[in-house]
């Protein structure tokens, strides 16, 4: 069976690709450029990941999405929230992570990306779209949830002739479990970029960096990306 993967080069999308590649033929990977701060870094690292797996890589620009997004993931005039391990703990007030999610939200981003990728999947007669949706982020990002996957599958049953489906191999996993699984399948995590910023090295303070750091700490392993960068 064949699949197309949505690849941002983040921990989750790289792990999902690595897992899917064990049982599916990955036809291509799509990276979206919607003006995000880390866009060029994501494109660079996604290209490296695709070279590792020997798969086709395309980049789709969504300038119009950048134009209507006012939150800090795209708008350089807004500050990206900085969080700590305590802020993302289950005992912490939910309002902290909810505010962080709101600050980096991009209007209907996953819906737009999945529908574009669905067109490619149908045109190439691919069965699946592989995504990095996971259990840890589903609480604050509803478009990472199983309910959303099922809703998209239902929509694709109407909008694609071959019934493209969304495959989310991490849907029940937290970040710690994702790191363990990624290491197990030898995912090229040295070229996975999670940071909301696009500097030479990860900031270490945005929510994505903090969740990644906690996951590696919990597994007792060093982050291959930081090792490669000498951080």
UniProtKB/Swiss-Prot annotation:
Enzyme type, top EC level: ligase
Official protein name in the record: 7-cyano-7-deazaguanine synthase
Family, as annotated: Belongs to the QueC family.
Residues at which ATP binds: 7-17
InterPro entries: QueC, Rossmann-like_a/b/a_fold
Cofactor(s) listed in the protein's UniProt record: Zn(2+)
Keyword Ligase attributed: yes
Transmembrane segments annotated in the record for this chain: none
Keywords: ATP-binding, Ligase, Metal-binding, Nucleotide-binding, Zinc
UniProt binding sites for Zn(2+): 195, 203, 206, 209
Cofactor binding, per record: Binds 1 zinc ion per subunit.
Record-linked PANTHER family: 7-CYANO-7-DEAZAGUANINE SYNTHASE
GO MF entry, a single one: zinc ion binding
Listed pathway(s): Purine metabolism; 7-cyano-7-deazaguanine biosynthesis
Domain of life according to the entry: Archaea
Function: Catalyzes the ATP-dependent conversion of 7-carboxy-7-deazaguanine (CDG) to 7-cyano-7-deazaguanine (preQ(0)).
Catalytic activity annotation: 7-carboxy-7-deazaguanine + NH4(+) + ATP = 7-cyano-7-deazaguanine + ADP + phosphate + H2O + H(+)
This enzyme's EC code(s): 6.3.4.20
Keyword Acetylation on entry: no
């Amino acid at each position: 069976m064949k699949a197309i993967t949505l690849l941002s080069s983040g921990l989750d999308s790289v792990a999902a690709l690595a897992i899917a590649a064990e049982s599916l033929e990955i036809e291509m990977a799509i990276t979206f450029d919607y003006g995000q701060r880390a866009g060029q870094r994501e494109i660079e690292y996604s290209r490296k990941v695709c070279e590792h797996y020997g798969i086709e890589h395309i980049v789709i620009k969504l300038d119009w999405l950048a134009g209507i997004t006012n939150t800090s993931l795209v708008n350089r005039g807004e500050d990206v929230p900085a969080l700590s391990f305590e802020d993302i703990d289950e005992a912490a007030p939910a309002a902290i992570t909810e505010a962080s999610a709101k600050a980096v939200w991009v209007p209907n981003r996953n819906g737009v990306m999945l529908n574009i990728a669905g067109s490619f999947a149908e045109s190439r007669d691919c069965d699946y779209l592989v995504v990095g949706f996971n259990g840890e982020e589903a609480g604050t990002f509803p478009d990472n949830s199983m309910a959303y996957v099922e809703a998209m599958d239902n929509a694709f049953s109407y909008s694609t002739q071959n019934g493209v489906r969304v495959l989310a191999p991490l849907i029940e996993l937290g970040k710690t479990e994702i790191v363990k699984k990624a290491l197990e399948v030898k995912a090229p995590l040295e070229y996975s970029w999670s940071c909301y910023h696009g500097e030479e090295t990860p900031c270490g303070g945005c929510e994505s960096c903090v969740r990644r750091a906690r996951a590696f700490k919990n597994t007792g392993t060093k982050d291959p990306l930081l090792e490669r960068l000498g951080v």
